[in-house]
Amino acid sequence: MNSDATSKTYTSSTLKQNNHITKDMKYYILFGPPGAGKGTQATAMVEKYNLHHISTGALLRKEIAAGTELGLQAKALIEKGCLVPDEVVEGMIESEFKTVTGVDGFLLDGFPRTLPQAEALDAILAKTGEAVTATVSILIPDAMIMERIKGRALKEGRADDASEDIINNRIVTYHNQTEPLIEYYEKVEKYHEIDGIGTIEEVQGRIFDVMDKF
């Protein structure tokens, strides 16, 4: 990953090409349906806890903007509300782990979304004796998901948010493929639910209350 592609929430000096993952790092996972405000909350979490934000959406958008073969394939799937193949996403995630230093941990946003991805993440971290620290799941009702995404589409003119059919497909995809992860992480006592209804500050406070425990 090149320094010019880093997020504004951390400087390029934190990124170095290497093959070493520092021990005792924190690995947080942020869950939530589309429209739950994950992007806003992720920014606050990264800044407060000195984390490297790994967003599969951002990684894929970079490929799409570059017009790569992966980007073109991903664009077609995303526009239909479908998920990108696991092996592609997993490779990008592991690559991110290997290029970052100078932070206290990682915040994964948009990964894992399925049980196979969760198992793959465990396997990736196990290579260096690491494990997921905790998962934070922002919960909002389906009706609110639809309302928020449609409102965002009107303000930003986002083509992928303009169709109710696509929005419904994204909601169904989230429930069918992502929610089984609840049981997976509950079994190891790493699942934490956050009420996503309220102001940004209220939701943020609930998230910080959980993360402060680690």
Where are these regions (language model features)?
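Glycine-rich phosphate-binding loop of ATP-dependent small-molecule kinases
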Residues: 1-214
